[in-house]
């Protein structure tokens, strides 16, 4: 669903605010491909493991809709639920996931940044791994990368169901979106637990992982897109990526 944002000076509020539904959209599957796994050195997986890349596309004609989108558009899709075996969040099998982006107002001409590579699916336990979660922007905007807590969403596990329809989304939606709850021993600062490490270089998205615990983990990356307009630095877009990593003995 798409929700209108009426305040161009406060795109991602510190306190929870509700925004009206601008409209609904249905995305069509445009391509399905098996991609090569770019594992770190010494990390191998069985021949029966496949990673699929699925692309969804649609065209939407955005408009201001009587002023409700003076501050842009929040695009969100929620899905239930996660793998029961994820180590670092509470009740993963009952926790949803949310795909989110913010598009600037219609009087801003903009192209969102595109990630240059697929996320790394596997890392080796007890070994430091670096990976690129970088992106390019055809407009030449400044991109600032950071790691964030993955998004749970504003629904419960049973609402929406797995086969959610666009019309199931409520007439108002809360921003910031609710985040996952970390399990005991894990946190935003330590998503891999005690002794683990996770960092993202703000200028280029270079990401470093380290975990001495094996299992499945989820982490998040956020891109904020800035542009100078008439001497002012303005936020022009927000893009998120969530990564599920399998930490294994190599």
What are these regions (language model features)?
Residues 1-250:
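Long, compositionally biased, intrinsically disordered segments
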């Amino acid at each position: 669903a798409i929700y209108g944002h009426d305040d161009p000076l406060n795109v991602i509020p510190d306190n929870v605010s509700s925004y009206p539904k601008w409209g609904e959209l249905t995305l069509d599957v445009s391509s399905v491909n098996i991609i090569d796994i770019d594992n770190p050195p010494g990390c191998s997986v069985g021949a029966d493991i496949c990673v699929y890349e699925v692309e969804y596309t649609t065209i939407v004609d955005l408009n201001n809709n009587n002023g409700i989108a003076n501050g842009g558009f929040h695009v969100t899709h929620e899905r239930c639920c996660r793998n029961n075996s994820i180590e670092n969040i509470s009740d993963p099998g009952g926790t949803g996931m949310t795909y989110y982006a913010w598009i600037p107002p219609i009087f801003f001409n903009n192209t969102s940044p595109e990630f240059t590579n697929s996320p790394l699916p596997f890392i080796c336990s007890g070994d430091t791994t670096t990976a690129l979660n970088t992106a390019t922007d055809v407009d030449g905007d400044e991109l600032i990368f950071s790691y964030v807590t993955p998004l749970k969403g504003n629904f419960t596990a049973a609402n929406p169901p797995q086969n959610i329809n666009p019309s199931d989304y409520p007439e108002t939606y809360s921003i910031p979106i609710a985040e996952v709850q970390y399990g005991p021993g894990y946190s935003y600062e330590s998503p891999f637990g005690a002794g683990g490490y996770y960092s993202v270089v703000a200028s280029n998205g270079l990401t470093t992982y380290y975990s001495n615990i094996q299992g499945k983990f989820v982490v998040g990356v956020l891109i904020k897109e800035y542009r100078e307009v008439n001497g002012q630095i303005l936020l022009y877009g927000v893009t998120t990526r969530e990564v599920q990593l399998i930490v294994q003995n190599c």
